[in-house]
Amino acid sequence: MEIIAGTTDFYLEKDTAVAIGKFDGVHLGHRRLLEEILGRKKYGLAACVFTFDPTPAVLFGLSDGKELTTREEKRRLFERLGIDTLIEFPLTKETAATEPERFATEILAKQMNTRFVAAGEDLSFGKNGAGNAELLERMAPHLGFCVQTIEKIEVNGIEVSSTYIRKLVEEGRMEEAEEMLGMPYTCLLYTSPS
């Protein structure tokens, strides 16, 4: 798997199928998006995950940065699932101020050669989070790609989300968390010499 991190200056030569998101926990909802882009490999598209580093919530001080999975764990999961390219786009106040239309035109269409986007129904991107799946659907025909919006997944009548899974983990409700993750939950413990 190719990893592009720490730079906004990149170009993907191969046509791509892209999933955009934070992918914290790589839970069942995320996997649904990933299944869509992986399914496009049979049409010659490279499966590409686009994520922000740090997340917008961390950049703007709305989150403490606690995540279900570390960067290294996410990378291993993506590689195991068959993702071809992972882009960890550097999010700064400047890049976060990119208008959504410019993001779609310059980054998705030109830099990434996007031909297909799997978008969660709660996708937001660009300045003030103003970009969404609906905007991508409107712009897609003019930019040479198509968009499939994926509905939220529920487990036992509850919407799967990283926020809810973090709550389950904090409460020690591991079986429920693992059901939404679709895999066992692991945590890394670091020790220091005493």
Predicted regions and their residues:
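Conserved small/polar residues in nucleotide/adenosyl-binding loops
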Residues: 190-194
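Conserved acidic residues
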Residues: 15, 84, 115
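Classical nucleotidyltransferase
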Residues: 97-189
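A generic structural signal for well-ordered alpha-helical segments
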Residues: 40-41, 78, 140
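N-terminal catalytic cores of NTP/NDP-binding nucleotidyl/phosphoryl-transfer enzymes
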Residues: 7-71
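Active-site-proximal cofactor/substrate-binding loop regions of enzyme domains
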Residues: 47-111
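Short glycine/serine/threonine/alanine-rich loop segments
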Residues: 43-45, 83, 145, 183
